[in-house]
Amino acid sequence: MTDSATANGDDRDPEIELFVKAGIDGESIGNCPFSQRLFMILWLKGVVFNVTTVDLKRKPADLHNLAPGTHPPFLTFNGDVKTDVNKIEEFLEETLTPEKYPKLAARHRESNTAGIDIFSKFSAYIKNTKQQNNAALERGLTKALRKLDDYLNTPLPEEIDTNTHGDEKGSQRKFLDGDELTLADCNLLPKLHVVKIVAKKYRNYDIPAEMTGLWRYLKNAYARDEFTNTCAADSEIELAYADVARRLSRS
């Protein structure tokens, strides 16, 4: 049995509604990398869908009945409620398929795990209250970012040209897996954006300028509507971490 929109000769778009976390005002997009991940996937698929922001402080009764006990993001696909982000991603990739919809899976397995430990290192760094631990935790974050930078600067197999010489060997690709956004980017970029905004605001930490691959990656991401138009406002992200980012003390 298949849910494919093209099954049985039915070429109509499925009915999809994505429910994402609302911001402080109860209406705009809130800080939620998982919501943004699904928002980006649907946008990149080119499928028609509706987006509803959910105010967690006053969740409407009809939404409570739709997905009881579930926080956004979740979606309805032709009336069926789906709540697990990883399973939703897998379902959309298997259901919204070529020729009608683009394949978004990364071709290289390493692209799916690039930057995988950045967010956990960032969380430990930003939640720390002890001044004496700050430098070590900052180094941990920088090391994780550098590992991602190395991956982005290392040519993918298809980029390697036998005629390439010397300092021209570095990768110039736009994203993790090439010049097109993939599921790997939809997972990593929302988290990377949060790290960039919050670390600067609460620890005055900048991603090092010498990480040219990482900055190239971010620059290319910010040039894409699928990313920038699904981001929460910087102030929204900062507010979300106001109680999480602890003030450092010497005690």
Swiss-Prot record:
Region annotated Required for insertion into the membrane, chain positions: 1-98
Class of this enzyme: oxidoreductase
Catalyses which reaction(s): Na(+)(in) = Na(+)(out); K(+)(in) = K(+)(out); chloride(in) = chloride(out)
Keyword entries, A-Z: Cell membrane, Cell projection, Chloride, Chloride channel, Cytoplasm, Cytoskeleton, Golgi apparatus, Hearing, Ion channel, Ion transport, Membrane, Mitochondrion, Oxidoreductase, Sensory transduction, Transmembrane, Transmembrane helix, Transport, Vision, Voltage-gated channel
Single GO biological process annotation from the record: auditory receptor cell stereocilium organization
Keyword Membrane attributed: yes
EC number, as in UniProt: 1.8.-.-
Residues annotated as transmembrane: 34-54
Molecular-function GO terms, alphabetical: chloride channel activity; oxidoreductase activity
Tissue and organ distribution: Detected in cochlea, in cochlear and vestibular hair cell bundles in the organ of Corti (at protein level). Expressed neonatal and adult cardiomyocytes (at protein level).
Domain GST C-terminal positions: 101-241
Pfam hit, one: GST_C_2
Regulation: Inhibited by F-actin.
Cellular localization per UniProt: Golgi apparatus; Cytoplasm, Cytoskeleton, Microtubule organizing center, Centrosome; Cytoplasm, Cytoskeleton; Cytoplasm, Cell cortex
GO cellular component, one term: chloride channel complex
Topology in the lipid bilayer: Single-pass membrane protein
Domain description: The active G-site contains a monothiol Cys-X-X-Ser motif which mediates glutathione-dependent redox catalysis.
Function: In the soluble state, catalyzes glutaredoxin-like thiol disulfide exchange reactions with reduced glutathione as electron donor. Can insert into membranes and form non-selective ion channels almost equally permeable to Na(+), K(+) and Cl(-). Required for normal hearing. It is necessary for the formation of stereocilia in the inner ear and normal development of the organ of Corti. May play a role in the regulation of transepithelial ion absorption and secretion. Is required for the development and/or maintenance of the proper glomerular endothelial cell and podocyte architecture.
Subunit field text: Component of a multimeric complex consisting of several cytoskeletal proteins, including actin, ezrin, alpha-actinin, gelsolin, and IQGAP1. Interacts with AKAP9. Interacts with TPRN. TPRN, CLIC5 and PTPQR form concentric rings at the base of stereocilia and may form a complex. Interacts with EZR, MYO6 and RDX; the proteins may work together as a complex to stabilize linkages between the plasma membrane and subjacent actin cytoskeleton at the stereocilium base.
Sequence similarity: Belongs to the chloride channel CLIC family.
Listed name of the protein: Chloride intracellular channel protein 5
Species this protein is from: Rattus norvegicus (Rat)
Lineage, opening ranks: Eukaryota, Metazoa, Chordata, Craniata, Vertebrata
